[in-house]
Amino acid sequence: MEAYKNEPFVPEYDQSIKGIVTEIFKEQSAATVKRLREAFLKLLVNGIPPEFIFMGMLKEIIKKPKSEKFQMCVINECSFFENRSQNGQKAIMHLEAFIAKIMCLLVDKNLN
């Protein structure tokens, strides 16, 4: 029992968000976006607000070793899509658009 006292508790939704970001960096394709839609739906159905998902993804993406220019673009896109998600009705669409944009930024050679 002593071994578990020092381990921090990580909520399941944080683990899901880390998995989503890992997938984004592993493969940039339409098939990945389609696969990740299921993960987003699971988070949303379980009551995780889109704002938490956006901020969780942003924190995980910024941890990755990329250029400062890339990180600034990610922050800009996250704020743009989070704002659209708050003003719109279907959060899933804005989450998908955000990860598609991040995939485009990852492929862009000028930002890496």
Residue ranges of predicted features:
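AAA+ P-loop NTPase domains with strong preference for DNA replication initiators
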Residues: 1-112
